[in-house]
Amino acid sequence: MRSDGERALGGLLAAMHLRGMEDLPREVAEHARAAGFSHVMIYVTDLQQQLLVPLPGQRDAAGEPLETLRIDATLPGRAFRAVSVVRTRSPQDEGTPLLWVPLLDGTERIGVIGLAAPQDGKLTETRAKDLASLVAVMVISKRPHSDSFARLVRARPLTLSAEVLWNLLPPGTFANDDVVVSTALEPAYEMGGDAFDYALDGTTLHVSIFDAMGHDTSAGLTASIAMAASRNNRIHGMELAAIGEAIDAAIRRSSPAGSPPGSWPGSTCARGC
């Protein structure tokens, strides 16, 4: 016989197969009750990881719409920053214990989830962490095809070049037992020709950094061509020097006749074992 926690996770997983990002708060709240949680609040981080933004349609225990929170000045933000469970009590729900749990995909911080639990203890924390892990995976799986999510995590519109590059970049953070990768790009909303890429191939880590001249659309397109050429040739097993030559050739083929050499990117490719 399955436990309450197992039923909650299994039911949520089954329910979300044909649901979108907009359905996630409702489905999580419904199935979390089976695990003993009386109230659920899901927040995701914005592009610059300065704010925690609630998924739409959620309300606090008093029935008020959830507000955006600063990461550097709130208890949910502390859970996000410290990557640990933060305990407090709900001010709207008669002091019910409230757990703030980070949403993680590996080491990438997605946001936080707040869970009100009338009974606090080790089992409750374990169930909260399990639920948070599943919710994080669902956010990751639903966000690539959700325009509402893309709008939610942007404090202002992206430039066209930033739109191109953000959709090509790998996650900003990755870690396993042997290596940690952590990245950041600024200005996040106006980045032009700056980009990075990395990938594991067995025990080998490939890292590439691109810097096309300028901050306009042409710089973003040049960097995207460089990244695609790098990936394509890297996947086919080419050596570093040959990858660099392939990047240069791809940019030359795609550049209009007479375009200045300054529009080509500087690139750094590295491989570590």
Where are these regions (language model features)?
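Structured interaction and signal-relay segments at domain junctions
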Residues: 13, 24-84, 90
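Amphipathic alpha-helical coiled-coil segments that mediate homodimerization
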Residues: 8-12, 19-42, 71-75, 164, ...
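Amphipathic alpha-helical "output/dimerization" segments
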Residues: 121-140, 224-228
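Regulatory cytosolic signal-relay segments
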Residues: 131-191
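A short, aliphatic-rich beta-strand micro-motif
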Residues: 86-90, 94-105
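Catalytic core of PPM/PP2C metal-dependent serine/threonine phosphatase domains
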Residues: 27-38, 157, 161-170, 220-273
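Short beta-strand-to-loop transition segments that serve as allosteric relay/switch motifs
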Residues: 111-121, 212-213
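Signal-transmission linkers at sensory-effector interfaces
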Residues: 1-18, 141-144
